[in-house]
């Protein structure tokens, strides 16, 4: 338990129906008693049981300045594992800020970013992977991304890691006994069982690592470059995906001269769209700079939507664009399917994961594109309720664990001694413990919680 009692606004800033000020620490009830007066004089804050609520008034220096509700949680049955009081006042910056100031004057300290969840972690209410999931859940834009975060918060990843640790720990106990006490009558380790355990653990880690990229897309979204020749329909596509007229659309070639940005939700995926200048040869210095930025965005993007004018034959610029998309996560959209087709899609097909005929003015094409993007990025194959990795810290630890297990398997196949296998299994266990947060350094813990906002 922490010695200080902390206070902060737990809800988003700005106008709203309510705002919540959260207290956590041994003096939470004492602080609440100084700033909250129950409407029923027979009710006492100090005597309030956990999981109960009282209606009353908030006071500052003896002056009532708002009315609201106090929710009480007794340690250890609270989010942080400490005594917690949540004070719900009317929304709006002035009232909530005054309530926090009253709490500070009554003896509380300002909460640091992520301090509530950090206390939950330090008090054993959450593991480190679950604490990381809290921020993922707060940041989630799509239903699947939120489901992935909720699964991690519920302990899906922690349980999966625990199962692999248990399997390797049992194996290591036998290996250690065999290596350290060769003169004792220790049963010989069954090599088939050894191979089976190592293979199963590696398969599990391979699955987590393999799904990491698609899981990350669901959690964080992806940068998407819309590229193509002038008047191919790029800005029309941006407007279709955005659901409103974000970009100017005219018949004049070169209307878009700079990169136009817009975040959109396409199914369960957040796309950070970049509508780029039309690709062509030009002597206009401003347009040329826009085209240079277009190529740069294409190189940087995690997803490319290349738009081609289906009403015209392919040009040299079209073929150059196709070649630059080779080996990239790119979808070719042959636009204007409502007009007679003159575009030979077979010329560009080898360079793209898929080629789709679309009409960027029709809502039906939005659904077609959404399904194609989900297939290309692999998000349609993700079980949102399964264990998943989140963030570079977890991925790096999983990769180290996988490398150590693979090394143990190679050592067995090479016929080296069990002591060499034991070293590899030890390394794998260390990496899994780091993944679970069991041996995380203070620097790692700081890195996790610095992502959080004040009040969480």
Show the residue positions of the predicted features:
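C-terminal-of-GTPase-core extension/linker across diverse P-loop GTPases
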Residues: 2-9, 13, 143-265, 282-284, ...
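Short glycine-/small-residue-rich Rossmann-like dinucleotide-binding loops
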Residues: 242, 277-278, 302, 309, ...
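A glycine-rich (often HGG/GG-containing) alpha/beta subdomain
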Residues: 1-147, 151, 155, 331
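Inter-motif core of Ras-like GTPase G domains
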Residues: 287-311
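Generic enzyme active-site microenvironment
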Residues: 273, 307, 333
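Switch I (G2) and immediately adjacent beta-strands of P-loop GTPase domains
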Residues: 55-65, 70-74, 254-282, 300
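Short, Asp-centered acidic motifs that coordinate Mg2+ and/or phosphate
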Residues: 271, 303, 331
């Amino acid at each position: 338990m922490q010695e200080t009692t902390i206070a902060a606004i737990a809800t988003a800033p700005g106008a709203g129906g309510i705002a919540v000020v959260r207290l956590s620490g041994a003096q939470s009830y004492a602080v609440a008693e100084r700033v909250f007066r129950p409407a029923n004089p027979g009710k006492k804050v100090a005597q309030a049981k956990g999981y109960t609520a009282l209606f009353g008034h908030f006071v500052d220096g003896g002056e009532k300045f708002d009315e609201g509700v106090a929710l009480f949680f007794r340690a250890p049955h609270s989010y942080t594992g400490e005594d917690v009081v949540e004070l719900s006042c009317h929304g709006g910056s002035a009232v909530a800020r005054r309530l926090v100031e009253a709490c500070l004057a009554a003896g509380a300290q300002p909460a640091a970013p992520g301090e509530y969840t950090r206390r939950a972690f330090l008090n054993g209410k959450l593991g480190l992977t679950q604490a990381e999931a809290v921020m993922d859940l707060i940041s989630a834009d799509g239903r699947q991304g939120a489901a992935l975060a909720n699964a991690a918060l519920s302990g899906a990843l922690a349980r999966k890691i625990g199962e692999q640790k248990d399997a390797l720990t049992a194996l290591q106990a036998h290996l250690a006994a065999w290596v350290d006490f060769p003169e004792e009558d220790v049963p010989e380790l069954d090599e088939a069982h050894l191979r089976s355990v190592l293979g199963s653990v590696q398969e599990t880690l391979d699955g987590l690592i393999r799904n990491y990229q698609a899981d990350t897309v669901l959690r964080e979204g992806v940068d998407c470059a819309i590229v193509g020749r002038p008047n191919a329909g790029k800005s029309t596509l941006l407007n279709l995906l955005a659901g409103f007229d974000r970009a100017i659309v005219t018949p004049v070639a070169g209307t878009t001269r700079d990169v136009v940005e817009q975040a959109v939700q396409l199914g369960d995926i957040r796309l950070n769209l970049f509508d780029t200048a039309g690709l062509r040869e030009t002597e206009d210095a401003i347009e040329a700079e826009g085209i240079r930025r277009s190529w740069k965005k294409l190189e940087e993007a995690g997803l490319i939507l290349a738009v081609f004018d289906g009403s015209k034959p392919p040009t040299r610029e079209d073929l150059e664009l196709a070649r630059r998309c080779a080996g990239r996560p790119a979808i070719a959209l042959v636009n204007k399917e409502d007009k007679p087709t003159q575009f030979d899609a077979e010329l560009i097909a080898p360079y793209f994961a898929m080629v789709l005929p679309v009409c960027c003015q029709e809502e039906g094409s939005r659904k077609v594109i959404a399904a194609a993007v989900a297939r290309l990025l692999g998000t349609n194959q993700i079980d949102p309720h399964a264990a998943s990795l989140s963030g570079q810290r977890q991925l790096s630890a999983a990769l180290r664990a996988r490398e150590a297990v693979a090394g143990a398997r190679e050592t067995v196949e090479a016929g080296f001694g069990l002591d060499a296998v034991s070293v590899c299994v030890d390394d794998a266990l260390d990496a899994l413990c780091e993944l679970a947060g069991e041996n995380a350094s203070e620097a790692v813990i700081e890195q996790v919680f610095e992502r959080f906002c004040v009040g969480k």
